[in-house]
């Protein structure tokens, strides 16, 4: 492979626009105007954050005025800030959102103004701290499949973000126990209907061990986790996180590259002894696109392409959007679809026809097809595998600007003049009699993993993407819908949008 020729794929950073030069950058979010408080932040850091925000399409004022909607401060006492605001003679201070720097950080990471949560707001007067449990302890199950978690009730993001970073670090260190513990803790905290203000509020809640509680106590006391800040500065963690952001690169490959002394994507591309596989080459080739989040509008546009293609081949075909978008998420890393035919056997070779049609349309940038190895005679499987045996393909498609509805259109970098972007798409085609199990599994999140654990430990059943096997009756249970599976397990049905565990 000609690595040198791929260097052009890794773009050089553009020189940032100086503070005070908002006119040089397009303002994407006209409903939001920021003011960064220099006190405690310092002028150099304020200038840097101003340039960063403007580069992402935010309007930032240099002087506080009535045009400002969001005031962002760092390490300031609430009463001092509010006194400072009152002294500026603004028409209506009550309409301002006075926010901690964490809101700004979250917004920069997402590339858009995130929803203001309680943890972001700097309140004028303390309202008192509620240390009662956020919900009856008896109602919080140890199993995510018995909890309802939407995208709206994540009131403890200050904790769950830290837990997920600690879990990721543990995964890089191949520490399976701590990794699982932190992810279970994050899942429980996500399900709570209100914010946790003290440790007394979580007494009796499941999956919150002493290590987790110690981390939460540190956050409650200092507003941050020093362990996570240490991890973020760790060279190995930074390298592995960067390398695994490339499509086709897992933790083991990332670790191997790190041990060879590589620290950047450029170094990987210029290292003559590294042989990238086909998926990894595509990952580098389209890195600037597929490392960005996919919006719901983009997922909908991809859905129209897949639906039109699929129904052109088979008008009676069955198609479902799965993954995070089925759970109601606004953004995701890729777009997943389940495809099948109403008659058993008609699904054979289905994806190959879809792939050929996408090629004919000139929008197929990459394809990795895997044929079916599903064998009903080998059911049940006593060990769950992360990847099922159905035919599937991992694609990268070209999505045009005109195909995406809404004002924002495609997710692109400022200055990107292309009228298209690359999007990752996964297609899975199970037989119709396995469709319900595959749909449940591919909807994803910890909910599905805990559902399998619940089935085995509480019901003596084996559940995976292929079947539900009753070990007592020694037979596979039939299901044509997800509701059927919940009924077999003796569980209340949980809607997809309530499965964001």
Curated annotation (Swiss-Prot):
Gene Ontology terms for molecular function: DNA binding; DNA nucleotidylexotransferase activity; DNA-directed DNA polymerase activity; metal ion binding
Necessary cofactors: Mg(2+)
Sequence motif Nuclear localization signal, location on chain: 11-17
Residues annotated as binding Mg(2+): 334, 336, 426
Domain BRCT: 24-121
Main subcellular localisation: nucleus
Enzyme Commission number(s) from the entry: 2.7.7.31
Keywords assigned by UniProt, alphabetized: Magnesium, Metal-binding, Nucleotidyltransferase, Nucleus, Terminal addition, Transferase
UniProt entry tagged with the keyword Iron-sulfur: no
Catalytic reactions on record: DNA(n) + a 2'-deoxyribonucleoside 5'-triphosphate = DNA(n+1) + diphosphate
Cofactor binding note from Swiss-Prot or TrEMBL: Can also utilize other divalent cations, such as Mn(2+) and Co(2+) (in vitro).
Pfam family, one: BRCT
Entry GO CC: nucleus
SUPFAM superfamilies: BRCT domain, DNA polymerase beta, N-terminal domain-like, Nucleotidyltransferase, PsbU/PolX domain-like
Cross-referenced InterPro entries: BRCT_dom (IPR001357), BRCT_dom_sf (IPR036420), DNA-dir_DNA_pol_X (IPR002054), DNA_pol-X_BS (IPR019843), DNA_pol_b-like_N (IPR010996), DNA_pol_B_palm_palm (IPR028207), DNA_pol_lambd_fingers_domain (IPR018944), DNA_pol_lamdba_lyase_dom_sf (IPR027421)
Compartments (UniProt record): Nucleus
UniProt xrefs under CDD domains: BRCT_DNTT, NT_POLXc
Binding site for a 2'-deoxyribonucleoside 5'-triphosphate: 324-329, 333-336, 441-442
Residue ranges of the region described as Involved in DNA binding: 249-253
Biological process terms in GO annotation: DNA metabolic process; DNA modification; double-strand break repair via nonhomologous end joining
Similarity section: Belongs to the DNA polymerase type-X family.
Function: Template-independent DNA polymerase which catalyzes the random addition of deoxynucleoside 5'-triphosphate to the 3'-end of a DNA initiator. One of the in vivo functions of this enzyme is the addition of nucleotides at the junction (N region) of rearranged Ig heavy chain and T-cell receptor gene segments during the maturation of B- and T-cells.
Record-given protein name: DNA nucleotidylexotransferase
Source organism of the structure: Oncorhynchus mykiss (Rainbow trout)
Gene: dntt
């Amino acid at each position: 492979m000609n690595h040198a020729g791929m260097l052009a794929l890794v773009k050089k950073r553009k020189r940032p626009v100086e503070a005070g030069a908002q006119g040089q950058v397009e303002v994407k979010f006209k409903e939001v105007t920021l003011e960064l408080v220099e006190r405690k932040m310092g002028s150099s850091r304020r200038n840097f954050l101003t340039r960063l925000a403007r580069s992402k399409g935010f309007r930032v004022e240099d002087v506080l005025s009535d045009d400002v909607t969001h005031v962002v401060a760092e390490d300031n006492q609430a009463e001092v800030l509010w006194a400072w605001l009152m002294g500026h003679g603004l028409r209506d201070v009550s309409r301002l959102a006075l926010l901690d720097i964490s809101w700004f950080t979250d917004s920069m990471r997402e590339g858009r103004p995130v929803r203001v949560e309680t943890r972001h707001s700097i309140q004028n007067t303390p309202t008192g701290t509620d240390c009662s449990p956020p919900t009856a302890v008896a109602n919080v199950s140890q199993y995510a499949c018995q909890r309802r978690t939407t995208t709206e009730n994540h009131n403890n993001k200050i904790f769950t973000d830290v837990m997920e970073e600690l879990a990721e670090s543990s995964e890089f260190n191949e520490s399976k126990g701590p990794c699982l513990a932190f992810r279970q803790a994050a899942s429980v905290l996500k399900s709570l209907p209100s914010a946790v203000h003290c440790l007394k509020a979580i007494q009796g809640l499941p999956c919150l061990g002493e290590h987790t509680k110690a981390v939460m106590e540190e956050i409650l006391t200092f507003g941050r986790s020093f362990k996570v800040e240490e991890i973020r500065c760790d060279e190995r963690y930074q390298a592995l996180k960067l390398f695994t952001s490339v499509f086709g690169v897992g933790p083991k490959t990332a670790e191997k590259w790190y041990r060879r002394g590589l620290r950047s994507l450029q170094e990987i591309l210029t290292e003559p002894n590294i042989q990238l596989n086909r998926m990894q080459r595509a990952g580098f080739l389209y890195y600037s696109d597929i490392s960005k989040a996919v919006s719901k509008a983009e997922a909908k546009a991809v859905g129209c392409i897949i639906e039109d293609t699929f129904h052109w081949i088979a008008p009676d075909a069955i198609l479902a959007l799965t993954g995070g978008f089925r759970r109601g998420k606004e953004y995701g890393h890729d777009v997943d679809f389940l495809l099948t035919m109403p008659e058993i056997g008609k699904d054979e070779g289905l994806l190959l026809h879809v792939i050929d049609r996408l090629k004919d349309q000139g929008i197929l940038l990459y394809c990795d097809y895997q044929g079916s190895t599903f064998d009903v005679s080998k059911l049940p499987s006593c060990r769950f595998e992360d990847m099922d045996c159905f035919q599937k393909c991992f694609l990268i498609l070209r999505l045009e600007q005109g195909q995406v509805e809404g004002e924002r259109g495609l997710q692109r970098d400022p200055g990107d003049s292309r009228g298209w972007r690359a999007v990752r798409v996964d297609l899975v085609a199970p037989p119709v009699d396995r469709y319900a199990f595959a749909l449940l599994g591919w909807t994803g999140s910890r909910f599905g993993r805990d559902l399998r654990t619940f089935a085995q430990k509480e019901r003596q059943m084996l559940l995976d993407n292929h079947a539900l096997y009753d070990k007592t009756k020694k037979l596979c249970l039939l299901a044509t819908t997800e509701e059927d599976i919940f009924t077999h397990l003796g569980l209340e049905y949980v809607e997809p949008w309530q499965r964001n565990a």
